[in-house]
């Protein structure tokens, strides 16, 4: 979890039997944005297309900021920039589907990661409707159909905590990860 700038004072605990105030408060160094982004490029992550459909309409975007939170109840999180054009749609619909891509689906990832109109994004693949009403990619490695249970804002992003209502796995796909600012196929079956 990212720590807001106004909380960046290091906590201090004095050793037992030392007088109060024996330790000095220290301020943590803040890493600049480019250094942070360069370091994050070293963390490989699954490539996902996040979709929604509901009262606010249909939308989707590419994301790698997705991870498991807990298995009791099954919950994952998705990070979404509040400045993104799709943010109002996800914010109103309160449902989403995390579609984890397989190797070979890089063009679809690029399409959903750009400025392509929504109808053209969705026309580029085959979709089913999940239990929440969200589009579920037929050829996804795995799809997690979810309801947004909680939203926490940190910096420029909202962290969407998503209660999983259904999971669909593809039979024998190969995985796709984003690492060092490029796509990489996993060389053996992922499921």
Swiss-Prot record:
GO molecular function terms attached to this record: FMN binding; FMN reductase (NADH) activity; FMN reductase [NAD(P)H] activity; riboflavin reductase (NADPH) activity
Catalytic activity as recorded in UniProt: FMNH2 + NAD(+) = FMN + NADH + 2 H(+)
Any GO BP annotation: uracil catabolic process
UniProt-listed InterPro entries: Flavin_Rdtase-like_dom (IPR002563), NADH-dep_flavin_reductase (IPR050268), RutF (IPR019917), Split_barrel_FMN-bd (IPR012349)
E.C. number(s) listed in UniProt: 1.5.1.42
Induction cue: Up-regulated by the nitrogen regulatory protein C (NtrC also called GlnG) and repressed by RutR.
Keywords annotated in UniProt: Flavoprotein, FMN, NAD, Oxidoreductase
Keyword Transferase: no
Protein family: Belongs to the non-flavoprotein flavin reductase family. RutF subfamily.
Chain's role: Catalyzes the reduction of FMN to FMNH2 which is used to reduce pyrimidine by RutA via the Rut pathway.
Protein name: FMN reductase (NADH) RutF
The species this protein was found in: Escherichia coli O1:K1 / APEC
């Amino acid at each position: 979890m990212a720590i807001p700038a106004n909380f960046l004072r290091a906590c201090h605990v004095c050793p037992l039997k030392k007088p109060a105030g024996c330790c000095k408060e220290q301020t943590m160094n803040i890493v600049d944005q480019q250094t942070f982004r360069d370091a994050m490029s070293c963390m490989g992550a699954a490539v996902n297309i996040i979709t929604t459909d509901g009262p606010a309409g249909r939308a989707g975007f590419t994301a790698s900021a997705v991870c498991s939170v807990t298995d009791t109840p099954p919950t994952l999180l998705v990070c979404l920039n509040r400045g993104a054009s799709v943010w109002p749609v996800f914010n109103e619909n309160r449902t989403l589907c995390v579609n984890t891509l397989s190797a070979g689906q890089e063009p679809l990832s690029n399409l959903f990661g750009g400025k392509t109109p929504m109808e053209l994004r969705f026309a580029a693949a085959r979709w089913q409707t999940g239990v929440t009403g969200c589009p579920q990619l037929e050829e996804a490695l795995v799809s997690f159909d979810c309801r947004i249970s909680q939203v926490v804002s940190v910096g420029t992003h909202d962290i969407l905590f998503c209660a999983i209502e259904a999971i669909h796995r593809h039979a024998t796909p190969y995985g796709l990860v984003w690492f060092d600012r490029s796509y990489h196929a996993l060389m053996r079956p992922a499921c």
